[in-house]
């Protein structure tokens, strides 16, 4: 009986193993460009708060929950893992608080455990005069935020399950992980996007940016929104890897690429603009952080076109920013004198960021006003000086020495370059700005004014005319 060589026996296995590794690496390379987040289904826990008459009938309550779960599961398939259940007795007060408007919601500790769920959707069904009123709201465990409240009214009970499912779908706020691509461009990896039957399209959608700081167990130590930074997705379909490209719009320099210690996730939370005004407050960056009064606020809708003047801050440092119709986002300009202090994005109707800390620009504005008056004086002086020099040359050419001497004396009595420079130096020493950028601009404005003074008040031309008169004019006799 012939025996095979051990090397030949294991050779096909090695080839098969190598091929398997190559295939796995190829698949890993395709996925590693994005995040595995796109392959992870969203664990959605729906809690139904039904009318009191359902408390006496567990069958009706469970039947409604089963119908709702079936409708939600059929919508996204493997992208969602849905569980629907009625609340416990102790959870009812918490659920009612989650459905109130404009309330600081303090969720139970279990709602902050990312190991248990990704989202909690609260649904309440109530009787109304027109039939049945449905409310739904999303609590996202990853960003620890409540979404907007969704409300619907249907006439009959048979319409409630479908309306409740639609309310939940509308209430769920998209959350994504941010993947840095370029300094002003990122990609968003939406949870479970590669598991969806249809890739999500988010044309022109706006996102707030947040940093989630985690402990060793994956629980959030803090979820901090990045101030004055939004993301905007372009028109068009998503990429093949399920990600969505976005433009970074921020009033900060490199807001996403800053170094952060520990386990940190950069997340995007979709926000919907609203048609309602927002009041912006400006305050001094340095203690005691007094309000900044009289600062101009301008707006560029969509960041395009010429800035439109909105108003000046009042005694409290506040100004109201109206919303556009249809609502979107705008780029706010804060200007003081001729200096633009900030350009920050604002989503219409969003009260996420309403306070902007800026350097006190009053010393720089005082310097600007003073130097503008100095330049006005300089223009008047140069004009008068030029007229006197022209007349003096004409009198010298005609030999009218009496008039020439009178014009010479008028020229010598004008403010000289040295006096201008001395006044500028004294005033510059008095104007000190606590803001380094503002102080740098003050110094630059003074240097520019000195350059103009030295350029247009050159004494050489006047000195030459004085010498010419001294040489050519007849000397007056001291005796009659």
PLM features: what roles do these ranges have?
Residues 2-17:
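Bacterial N-terminal signal peptides that target proteins for export
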Residues 17-27:
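Bacterial N-terminal signal peptides
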Residues 115-158, 243, 331:
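Amphipathic beta-strand/beta-sheet edge segments enriched in Tyr/Trp
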Residues 343-367:
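Short beta-strand elements
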Residues 56-108, 388, 407-411, 421-426:
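N-terminal segment of the mature soluble domain
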Residues 149-153, 157, 161-195, 201, ...:
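Beta-strand/loop-dominated core regions that host nucleotide or nucleotide-derived cofactor-binding catalytic loops
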Residues 283-316, 320-329, 371-466:
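Conserved, compact domain cores that house catalytic/ligand-binding motifs in diverse enzymes
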Residues 33-75, 284-288, 360, 364-382, ...:
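A structural "domain/chain start" motif
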């Amino acid at each position: 009986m012939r025996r095979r060589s051990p090397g030949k026996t294991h050779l096909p296995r090695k080839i098969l193993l190598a091929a398997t590794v190559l295939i796995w690496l190829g698949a890993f390379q395709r996925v590693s460009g994005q995040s595995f987040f796109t392959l992870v289904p969203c664990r959605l826990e729906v809690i139904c708060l039904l009318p009191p008459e359902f408390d006496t009938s567990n069958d009706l309550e469970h039947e409604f929950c089963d119908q709702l779960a079936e409708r939600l599961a059929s919508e996204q398939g493997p992208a969602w893992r849905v569980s629907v259940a009625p609340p416990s007795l102790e959870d009812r007060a918490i659920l009612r608080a989650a459905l109130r408007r404009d309330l600081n919601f303090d969720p139970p500790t279990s709602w902050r455990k990312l190991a248990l769920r990704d989202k909690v959707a609260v649904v309440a069904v109530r009787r109304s005069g027109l039939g049945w009123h449905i409310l739904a709201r999303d609590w996202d465990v990853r960003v620890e935020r409540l979404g907007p409240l969704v409300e619907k009214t249907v006439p009959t009970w048979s319409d409630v399950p479908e309306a409740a499912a639609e309310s939940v779908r509308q209430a769920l706020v998209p959350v994504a992980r941010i993947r840095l691509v370029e300094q002003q461009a990122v990609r968003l990896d939406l949870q479970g996007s590669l598991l969806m039957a249809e890739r999500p399209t988010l044309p022109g959608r706006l996102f707030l940016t947040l940093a989630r700081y985690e402990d060793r167990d994956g629980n959030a130590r803090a979820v901090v929104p990045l101030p004055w930074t939004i993301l905007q997705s372009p028109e068009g379909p998503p990429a093949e890897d399920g990600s969505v490209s976005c433009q970074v719009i921020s009033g900060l320099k490199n807001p996403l690429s800053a170094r952060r210690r520990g386990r940190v996730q950069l997340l995007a939370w979709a926000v919907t603009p609203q048609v309602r005004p927002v009041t912006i407050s400006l305050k001094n960056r340095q203690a005691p952080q007094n309000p900044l009064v009289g600062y101009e606020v301008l707006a560029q809708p969509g960041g395009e076109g010429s800035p439109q003047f909105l108003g000046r801050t009042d005694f409290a440092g506040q100004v109201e920013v109206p919303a556009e119709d249809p609502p979107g986002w705008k780029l706010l300009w804060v200007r003081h004198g001729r200096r633009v202090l900030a350009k920050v994005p604002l989503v219409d109707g969003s009260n996420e960021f309403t306070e902007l800390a800026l350097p006190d620009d009053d010393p720089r504005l005082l310097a600007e006003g003073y130097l503008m008056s100095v330049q006005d004086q300089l223009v008047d002086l140069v004009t008068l000086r030029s007229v006197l020099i022209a007349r003096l040359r004409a009198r010298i050419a005609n030999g009218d020495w009496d008039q020439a001497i009178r014009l010479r004396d008028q020229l010598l009595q004008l403010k000289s370059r040295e006096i201008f420079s001395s006044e500028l130096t004294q005033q510059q020493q008095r104007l000190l700005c606590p803001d380094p950028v503002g102080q740098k601009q003050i110094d630059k404005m003074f240097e520019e004014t000195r350059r103009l003074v030295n350029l247009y008040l050159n004494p050489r031309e006047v000195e030459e005319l004085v010498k010419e008169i001294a040489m050519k004019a007849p000397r007056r006799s001291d005796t009659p």
